[in-house]
């Protein structure tokens, strides 16, 4: 048996109805409930990322991963939860005042082309932002500016291009025509339930990655992680619920990766 790791080439957390960019933050925070710097009555975030699959494909072609693309080869996305180290963190407040989320489902979806399964691929940039909130006082002391609205964000993929639908897709299936995409048309790669909210991400990407290796799937520009629409659309909450996972900028051995086992 051989095990191979593929790492992220870029990642970002986009926030509902906001131009903020947090692409260089070491933690991605998925939240829902009362809005954090977004438009009422509810707010939420979605995480997007891409994988550098070139080394994996080259190792398969060279025979280093000898089984090639067979049913025996599996691919699992692994991300470490920032609350997985201390059970005392359950049901407590995070540093921003949000409550650690429990009992929820996350989806892993493929970033769609401009009209769903057709059209042009949506290429996007990671961005240079860090914080959700601008803090000019820190800038005046000579610290690196942590707040940025440079793309990507909820609306933009790059400086001169936008998502075909703000936030990538509509979670209430209200998009029409070829300019947007509904949740019902997304390619859902996997879904994971979190009972306590301190579990690590373990998404099964076996079929998705194998289809890229064989050429069955082309033009992929990455994937996203989000709460299921039923959670994103909850209104009337008076608190914010959140869960955090380490991103590629963690600078620790908790860096996220795709694990290939053959």
Regions found by a protein language model. Give the residues of each.
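Secreted, disulfide-rich extracellular signaling modules
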Residues: 1-262
């Amino acid at each position: 048996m051989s095990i191979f790791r593929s790492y992220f080439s870029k990642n970002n957390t986009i926030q509902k109805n906001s131009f903020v960019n947090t692409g260089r933050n070491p933690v991605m925070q998925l939240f829902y409930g009362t809005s954090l710097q977004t438009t009422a009555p509810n707010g939420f975030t979605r995480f997007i990322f891409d994988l550098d699959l070139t080394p994996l494909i080259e190792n398969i072609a060279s025979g280093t991963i000898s089984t090639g693309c067979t049913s025996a080869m599996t691919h699992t996305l692994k991300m470490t939860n920032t609350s997985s180290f201390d059970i005392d963190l359950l049901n407590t407040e995070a540093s921003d005042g949000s409550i650690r989320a429990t009992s929820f489902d996350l989806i892993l979806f493929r970033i769609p082309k401009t009209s769903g399964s057709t059209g042009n691929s949506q290429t996007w940039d990671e961005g240079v932002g860090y914080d959700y909130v601008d803090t000019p006082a820190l800038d005046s002391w000579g610290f690196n500016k942590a707040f940025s609205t440079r793309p990507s964000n909820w609306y933009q993929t790059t400086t001169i291009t936008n998502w075909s639908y703000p936030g990538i897709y509509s979670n209430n299936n209200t998009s029409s025509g070829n300019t947007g995409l509904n949740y019902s048309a997304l390619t859902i790669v996997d879904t994971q339930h979190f009972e306590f909210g301190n579990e690590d991400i373990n998404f099964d990407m076996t079929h998705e990655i194998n289809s890229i290796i064989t050429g069955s799937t082309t033009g992929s520009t990455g994937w996203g992680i989000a709460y299921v629409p039923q959670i994103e659309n909850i209104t009337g909450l008076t608190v914010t619920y959140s869960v955090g996972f380490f991103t590629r900028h963690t600078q620790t051995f908790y860096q996220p990766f795709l694990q290939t086992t053959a």
